[in-house]
Amino acid sequence: MIPESTIHKAVELLKKAANPVKIILFGSYARGDITEASDLDFLVIEKELKARRMEMVRLSDVLRPLRIPVDVLVASEKVFNDWADTPGTVLYEAAREGKVLYEKA
């Protein structure tokens, strides 16, 4: 199990690296059904996003020093708002089951 303090550090690193609108923890850690195989699943929502895949790789690299199993997905604010109500999408899952760990004021 990944300690809460490490999750907090991950959020702080993502905030500094991405200047996000919102960071959502979703998946098993958000649902509370954590197993030994569980990783952290973060959705980082940015105001605008030009190169989604490159940004996912970049943010994953930012978290590498924490040495934890993690998946970082990114979406623009518009894409998130357009797809968050569409069942069967990761954005729907994150919107419904996720925990908002950071939201820009």
Features from the language model and the residues they span:
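Catalytic core of pol beta-like nucleotidyltransferases
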Residues: 1-22, 31-36, 47-105
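Short hydrophobic/aromatic beta-strand micro-patches
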Residues: 43-45
